[in-house]
């Protein structure tokens, strides 16, 4: 089967998300990276793309060049991934959708409701795929939790509590660090800082696992470091359309927490807990029964969890990267 042609905007050298997309897109031999505009510095972006194997005539200096260069090619890319700063997502996604490209965009897709509605309309009219990368929902044991909820194994959901909090931006001197500073600058990040960066993952996880949508909410945003225009901490209370009560905390100044993304779902007949720092395990407690640890790869999992378990039981999902380290 011929590989799909893939292009990337953003995710340049030194970024965290760029290598994750490049490894992920090409892990199963389904995609080949054939075009890219990888950096806001045109020459750096072109040079890095060529080092990654992109032909010189498809290593672009910016997204506008990439759109102009790809739209009329007979071998144009099949999918464009947008991994640029938040405030640029809407403009880039809209332009590529209107030109007839499929788009996978990093979160958040837009910073305004009307922009989101416009993207939905354009995607529907174009007939093209337009998706947002909520990557944590693809962990096997997250899929197991969702399947258990859907199957009624913990009864009607009463309460969901989720948080995504870390302390890696807790140093006020980070005001001078460009890799941190942009996240709290409205010109680059849009109208939200920490919530758009991490809290949105927690909100999506609540909707995804509970198989329900947020209907109403109230929120308290705070900038605990005075130099920051946008929030570095937020608390959100919400209600879902099915009646579930929700609680969410997200913070980048919670010193001592490393990658504190977890979710707890409490139903009428049981509870579930999953944490990204222990992604191979799902904690299940039936009402009146003993707490159980459900392991990735064990027998009896729901089909979606089995399908996405890429390595055998007791191995971390990062096992192939340990092998990759031997070659580097």
What does each model-found stretch correspond to?
Residues 38, 81-82, 105, 162:
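Redox-cofactor binding/interface segments in oxidoreductases and associated redox assembly factors
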Residues 59-60, 198-217, 222-271, 276-280:
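Glycine-rich, aromatic-lined ligand/substrate-binding cores of catalytic
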Residues 135, 208, 235, 240, ...:
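C-terminal glycine/acidic-rich active-site capping loop/insertion
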Residues 1-54:
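N-terminal Rossmann-like dinucleotide-binding module
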Residues 79, 85-138, 152:
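Beta-strand-loop-alpha-helix segment that lines the small-molecule cofactor/substrate pocket
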């Amino acid at each position: 089967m011929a590989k799909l042609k893939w292009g990337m905007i953003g995710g340049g050298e030194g970024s965290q998300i760029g290598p994750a997309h490049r490894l992920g897109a090409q892990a199963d031999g389904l995609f080949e990276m054939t075009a890219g505009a990888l950096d806001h510095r045109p020459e750096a972006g072109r040079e890095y793309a060529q080092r990654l194997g992109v032909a010189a005539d498809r290593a672009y200096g910016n997204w506008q060049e990439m759109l102009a260069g790809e739209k009329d090619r007979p071998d144009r890319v099949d999918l464009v991934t947008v991994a640029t700063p938040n405030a640029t997502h809407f403009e880039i996604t809209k332009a590529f959708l209107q030109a007839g490209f499929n788009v996978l965009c990093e979160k958040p897709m837009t910073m305004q409701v009307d922009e989101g509605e416009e993207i939905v309309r354009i995607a529907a009219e174009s007939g093209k795929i337009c998706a947002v990368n909520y990557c944590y929902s693809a962990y096997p044991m997250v899929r197991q939790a969702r399947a258990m909820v859907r199957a009624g194994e913990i009864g009607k959901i009463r309460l969901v509590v989720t948080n995504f909090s870390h302390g890696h931006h807790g140093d006020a001197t980070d005001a001078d660090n460009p890799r941190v500073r942009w996240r709290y600058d409205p010109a680059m990040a849009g109208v939200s800082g920490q919530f758009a960066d991490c809290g949105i993952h927690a909100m999506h996880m609540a909707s995804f696992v509970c198989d329900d949508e947020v209907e109403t909410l109230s929120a308290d945003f705070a900038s605990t470091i005075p130099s920051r225009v946008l929030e570095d901490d937020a608390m959100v209370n919400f209600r879902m359309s099915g009646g579930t009560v929700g609680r969410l905390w997200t913070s980048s100044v919670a010193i001592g927490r490393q990658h504190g993304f977890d979710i707890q779902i409490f139903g009428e007949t049981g509870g579930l807990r999953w944490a990204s720092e222990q992604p191979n395990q799902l904690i299940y407690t039936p009402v009146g029964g003993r707490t159980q640890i459900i392991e990735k790869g064990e027998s009896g999992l729901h089909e979606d969890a089995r399908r996405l378990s890429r390595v055998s039981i007791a191995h971390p999902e990062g096992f192939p990267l340990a092998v990759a380290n031997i070659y580097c």
